[in-house]
């Protein structure tokens, strides 16, 4: 039997450990809350990067331009079982534009959109093979000056990507080596967007737990 004083302490301890706020499930990364968490990635000869009215504008670099979100860890965003949604537009150029680098557990990978001449889609890198060489390689046509909606799902055993509502990547990552292609893309970790000799815009970046 628990005495009155002990019962009170037990109830207080239970309240402190079980009655906190529920875990956060959604982050709007281009909202005012995270305005100070974005910066240019600092790539060699990159174009101008601006953040205004909930949108990222990336001017063409020589060859690459990047935007980096540095608050992934401090904001306690997930590294698995989460989804990323955003819209990307290629304004000028004919290479990748809405390319996003993101965490997967203890690693990072990059979703290439419109690379290798304008149409290639895929994940870099799986088992040291980049998006043009592994099983995620695909092709899609992207018209300039149009918004293209993108959804990425990071699950325990697989990665899935939809562009314009169409499933374009569905790959198992169980037992696979996940990594980034060597070079300036590493400056976009833990999360960021990159273009290659291309002017682009990105908006509506939302991360949600699955």
Where are these regions (language model features)?
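Extracellular carbohydrate-recognition regions
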Residues: 21-42
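Short carbohydrate-recognition loop motifs
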Residues: 48-66
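Secretory/extracellular carbohydrate-interaction modules
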Residues: 63-126
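Beta-strand-rich interaction surfaces with strong enrichment in secreted/lumenal proteins
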Residues: 70-76, 136-142, 191-192
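Extracellular beta-strand elements of beta-rich domains used
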Residues: 86, 205-207
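Short, aromatic/His-centered strand-loop micro-motif at the edge of beta-sheets
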Residues: 127-149
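Localized edge beta-strand/strand-to-loop motifs within extracellular or lumenal beta-rich domains
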Residues: 146-160
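Flexible glycan-contacting loops in extracellular carbohydrate-active proteins
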Residues: 171-201
């Amino acid at each position: 039997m628990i005495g009155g004083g002990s019962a009170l302490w037990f109830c207080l301890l239970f309240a402190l450990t079980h009655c906190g706020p529920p875990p956060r499930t959604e982050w709007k990364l281009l909202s005012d809350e995270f305005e100070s968490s974005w910066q240019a990635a600092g790539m060699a000869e990159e174009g101008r990067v601006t953040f205004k009215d909930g949108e990222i504008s990336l001017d063409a670099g020589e060859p690459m331009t990047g935007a980096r979100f540095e608050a992934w860890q401090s904001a306690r965003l997930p590294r698995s079982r989460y989804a990323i949604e955003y819209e990307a537009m290629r304004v000028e150029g004919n290479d990748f534009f809405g390319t996003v680098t993101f965490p997967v557990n203890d690693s990072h990978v990059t979703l290439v959109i419109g690379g290798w001449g304008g149409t290639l889609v895929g994940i870099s890198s799986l088992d040291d093979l980049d998006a043009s060489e592994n099983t995620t390689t695909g092709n899609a046509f992207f018209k300039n000056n149009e918004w293209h909606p993108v959804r990425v799902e990071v699950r325990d055993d697989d990665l899935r990507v939809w562009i314009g509502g169409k499933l374009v990547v569905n790959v198992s990552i169980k037992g696979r080596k996940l990594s980034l292609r060597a070079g300036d893309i590493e400056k976009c970790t833990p999360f960021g967007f990159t273009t290659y000799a291309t002017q682009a815009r990105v908006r509506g970046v939302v991360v949600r737990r699955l």
